[in-house]
Amino acid sequence: MEFELSRLQPKERASFALRALYEDAGCRKYHMGRFEEYGLYQENRSFLSSEQVITFTDLDGRLLALKPDVTLSIAKTAQPAKGETLRYYYHENVYRPSAESHTFKEISQMGLEMLGTVGEAEVQQAVCLAAKSLGLLGSAWVLEISHMGYLFGLLDALNVPAEMRPVLLEKLRAKNAHEFRTAAEAAGLDRSEADVLVELLSLNGSYADVLPKAEAFCRNERMRNAAEELRALAEPLEAAGGSIRLDLTLAGEMEYYNGLIFQGYLKSLPRPLLKGGRYDLLIRKFTPGAGAIGFAVYLDELDRLSAPLPPVQKQQTEKVMLNVALPKGRLGDKVYNLLAKIGYGCPEDYNATRKLVVENPEAGIRYFLVKPSDVAIYVEHGAADVGIVGKDILTEA
């Protein structure tokens, strides 16, 4: 009997394609067990996406954990020699809490790590492999790139206190200019300094357009060094195809990333499929003087590509419809009225008809009226492309 690749699920086909890509690039497969001693995660909590870990006591009395992270285990055991660069790829399951379901999820990951001597060539290879990974997974993709050194350099130039930096990075990630400015002023910046910081929000767009602006915006040597590293990536990335964007509002966790960071998207998927960056701070806890860069591909996200559409989305229209999950109540009404004023209203009044789905095919928009707590679930499962929620729901999440 012949084996047909078409019978495989998208994530199964992806794993074969990515394995070939990484092995051709000189990476060796890294094998690890399902369990890790809990002490590793307890001692390195700041490097984890969540402090919640599934633990159990082994028969010999040791406290073990179902691994929530692969990179941490590789960083602990790799131990590259001076002058050596280790290249690994992995295909593992990790166990993390889901903000949407408030339960633990088993997540299938493939990833790539380069550890040891990590210079310009290794950085370029890792980022280009991230772009090629996206190219193998879909025809329409976007890779967004930023640099934590650039952001730290600007915070240094403005003398932002260390204890206020995590708050500012959180507001920067939210891309909310008003709250970003408020946080900047709370950190002790005057109006002109806050204006400089808020200008970061404009450094977002195509790589070729934004890079010269980022170079001109530099305030110190640390920012210039980061801009030079971004400039060195321009030519290799140009040959990668796809859409490459420079987004200096993209900020990783400051305890984890210290250089380039990047994340990748595929058309029709609501959140990043690929995330990565440079994490020298982590590898140096185990191997002093070493560097590291890598990324993970979240294969489970590819299941959405083969999932059946909700019945309302199967209706054929000439235009591609934007599906919006609106919370029932005042917030939903307010957002709907704002959108209606600029041409995105619907012929029928959902409050009058009590319908939970209304649409305007001419404007290419469809609204789902849902409980505020269900908005994230609609987006999570791909029924809606975007959702509107208030601060109370965000706080709960």
Model-derived segments and spans:
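Short, conserved phosphate-binding/catalytic loop or strand-edge motifs used
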Residues: 106-110, 146-153
